[in-house]
Regions:
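A broadly conserved sequence feature marking short terminus-proximal activation segments
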Residues: 1-4
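Short cysteine-rich clusters marking metal-coordination/redox-active sites
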Residues: 6-9, 29
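Short functional micro-motifs and their immediate structural scaffolds
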Residues: 11-15, 37
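Acidic/histidine-rich catalytic cores and adjacent linkers
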Residues: 26, 33, 37-49, 142-148, ...
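RNase H-like nuclease fold core
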Residues: 28, 35, 66-161, 280
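Short, charged amphipathic recognition helices of the HTH superfamily
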Residues: 54-64
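Conserved beta-strand -> loop -> alpha-helix junction used to position metal-binding or nucleic-acid-contacting
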Residues: 97, 146-195
Length: 374
């Protein structure tokens, strides 16, 4: 067995010096005359135990001691922030979506067709948050999105050459929200039928036929949608305002040319079949929601970190537990760096990699009394 280093002076001039009352080998340094024992670092093993529980259906109530020993062994890992990797992988398609954990806490997730590429914690879906997410990912050929606010601005700045496919299912749902499934007017019936056909377009010919049918609908009901009503107070408003909003939502997508990117021959010849919806990523994003349901009762901060842990473990090459503990930031390390910087330095850095600076301040309190988020 190699002689250990003295933790006090770093010398290897040590010798065995009996055993402690628990039976552990005691060592004595010949230089500084200090005695010490070696401690086995099992933090990586405990982190694996923690992640095994978090990503499973195991209940703490079913553990020995009703989970008290488990909580004591793994409490420190709730202070770790899993950070997204910087990847140079150029993907054919990237899906972007957000998970809201509270009214003003959102985790934006970007993933390829196989694994998670990155994530970002923010207060809402805005251009600043999307830019922080997209800046760490190589521009793909096509990005599929549900049309979250701020995405287009961020894409124009960071991924200007990337084609956008607006999720056709979300476009249909937006129309259905205005028309309902049982429209009261013929215009609403026809528009709802058109919206359903939007989900069935499979090639460029069917896409062109849908666009022609939509143009005819707009022309046929143009005068009908211009009708106005004046109420008793003298205020004038559009009679069919909800139909107008449904039309405007589709018209904006047609003008942006983002509805039928997936059947563009120039892209399909080079990239093959492309997705029309982000249903695949929606179903995968349902997994962290299911994980949170399995572990009901977590605080908001722990729910955020749980989703970040899920994202990290579903990247292409998740780090081993020992490397995670060496590489990832903790609450204490982040707070220490923030205290070390002046206000001007913090302002010049912009948003932190793990999320908005505002989220950090609101998730941590300086007094023993907390505030409820939900």
């Amino acid at each position: 067995m190699a002689r250990p280093l003295c933790p006090a002076c770093g010398s290897r001039s040590v010798q065995k010096w009996g055993r402690t009352s628990s039976g552990a080998q005691r060592w004595r340094c010949g230089d500084c005359r200090g005695a010490f024992t070696l401690k086995i670092d099992n933090s990586a093993k405990r982190l694996d135990e923690f992640l095994g529980w978090l990503l499973s259906k195991k209940r703490q109530a079913d553990m020995p001691g009703a989970g008290r020993t488990f909580r004591s062994r793994t409490r420190e890992f709730w202070h770790v922030w899993p950070l997204p990797p910087v990847t140079g992988e150029v993907c054919r398609v990237v899906f972007v979506d957000g998970i809201y954990l509270a009214r003003n806490v959102c985790v934006l997730i970007a993933r390829s067709e196989e694994h998670v590429l990155g994530w970002y914690v923010s207060k809402s879906e805005n251009s600043r948050a999307y830019k922080a997410l997209m800046a760490r990912i190589a521009p793909p050929d096509v990005v599929v999105t549900d049309g979250g606010s701020g995405f287009q601005k961020a894409r124009r700045e960071l991924w200007p050459n990337t084609r956008v496919q607006r999720c056709t299912f979300h476009a249909f749902e937006q129309v259905k929200r205005y028309t309902t499934t049982r429209p009261r007017t013929q215009a609403g019936v026809d528009l709802y039928a058109l919206a359903k056909k939007l989900l069935k377009a499979e090639d460029s010919g069917q896409a062109a036929a849908w666009l022609a049918a939509y143009a005819r609908w707009c022309s046929d009901y143009d005068e009908f949608l211009r009708e106005e009503t004046t109420n008793d107070e003298g205020r004038t408003f559009l009679t069919h305002e909800r139909l107008v909003k449904a039309r405007n939502s589709l018209t904006a997508l047609v003008r942006q040319n983002t509805l039928f990117t997936y059947v563009d021959p120039a892209l399909t010849e080079r990239l093959g079949a492309l997705p029309a919806t982000n249903n695949a990523v929606e179903s995968l994003n349902g997994q962290p929601r299911h994980m949170l349901r399995e572990h009901r009762g977590l605080s908001l901060e722990r729910r955020v970190k749980a989703v970040c842990w899920w994202c990290h473990m579903h990247t292409e090459c998740p780090l081993p537990a020992a490397e995670i503990l060496r590489a990832m930031s903790t609450d204490e390390s982040i707070a220490r760096e923030m205290r070390a910087m002046s206000y001007e330095d913090r302002a010049s850095l912009g948003p932190q990699r793990w999320g908005d600076g505002l989220v950090w301040e609101e998730l941590h309190r300086s007094t023993p009394w907390g505030r409820d988020w939900d």
